[in-house]
């Protein structure tokens, strides 16, 4: 049941971009902003049965404004004074109240399924399991009807009301290299479109979610702040970001002076607003002057296109594949063995092009399945020679970061980076600290892929999808931190994975009915079409437009632009060869 609920939610995310699902609240933390309550929230009415009143109270907690004022209408004054609504909210469904009734007082205990949590920053994460007993709830009869007189601290939020009240939006922060922006999805309970821009910029100023604080850069960090609410480009207060009205953002206390940093600052704002359907031009001022004199009349997404989070890496490189253990390029319906080492070497079992499409990392595995199996990692330019960068009994499929380092897992639990030394030209092997991952999820890492911005790593551990942040320490070393599980509905069926976008992972599974599924950063999973696929699927590669999988009949593809009536996988001409595996930048 949980999987079907999440599947419906995630389908809405894919189709709508800004789906009618979870989203956060106020410009600072949830509940601190004063604004009118959404019109769809219930209110207590005389004659309301205690069970109904409790359920309506859970719905009213969906509005965090004014310290959950809408929900406090269901409480006595003493209960409202005592109730601590700070911190994260638990999202619950299938709620059952077990009541002991008296003429003037009702005592109730609550049972429910946990579907997720919503932090005070608006960060939603899926979860599963039964709600531990939160403690008794007491109701008393008053002159205005039944009211809650005692309740546990914390917020329990009705799942259905959550979906109808909150909207998913994405904040963007800069990656450490300054080449692109990184998604940070949030859930926002703002029904007035003209308030949304102020809400989102305020959240940018408040910073990234805690687990990304050391993985991204925020060019809008303090002391920078908003001088006032976001308006239309001409200063008007209605129609913000609609039509040609644009948006005007007035900042103050700017400390960023160099042009590139100001460009990144603008990119964070522009992509955050543009992805929320708040259209430009974007007039961005700082301390009473244009952020950049070149764009005094307003910025557009074209002005920050170099950081576009939706662009496919190395798109010009095209699709490659491993066929018969060697790397080939697909030219129309013909395959051509690439020149150089990667075309000559046999026994290649996993490969990836660099983010630019100019370099290749490939794993060669000898004596597969034998006790003395041996694997080695080779790195080089596409069409040229290669150097050995690592070895072991087995190596995971390689993955490239934005700084042209190759990440690989050696012998199922040793994560390392291989990067070319500028002086010698030889690759250096640098261990990655994965203690946080192995401590919480101690199984074998059978696949590891970096997100396109390089700030997150998705792994397959014991058939589950595990996400972690990528942090660089002050000493220059790298670590995988804050691991958490995604896609509880996938069980332990996951075989391999690939990042489709910075917010969306696609996985292959050993599930006959659902061999390919999606899961996003929130942990919400949904199933891709299965028609036309045969299992087992042993490899996957994806970009924003197309997903490629390797199965018994060869390489199959599914396009995001497929018509709704054509929900089936298509053969990739030239790659319908047993054992062929797709290779893309990533």
UniProtKB/Swiss-Prot annotation:
Record family assignment: Belongs to the LpqB lipoprotein family.
Protein's cellular compartments: Cell membrane
Signal sequence extent: 1-17
Membrane topology recorded in Swiss-Prot or TrEMBL: Lipid-anchor
InterPro entries according to UniProt: GerMN (IPR019606), Lipoprotein_LpqB (IPR023959), Lipoprotein_LpqB_C (IPR018910)
NCBIfam families named among the record's database cross-references: PRK13616.1
PROSITE patterns: PROKAR_LIPOPROTEIN
Protein name: Lipoprotein LpqB
Chain spans, region Disordered: 26-45
Keywords: Cell membrane, Lipoprotein, Membrane, Palmitate, Signal
Positions of N-palmitoyl cysteine lipidation: 18
CC annotations in GO: plasma membrane
Lipid-attached positions, S-diacylglycerol cysteine: 18
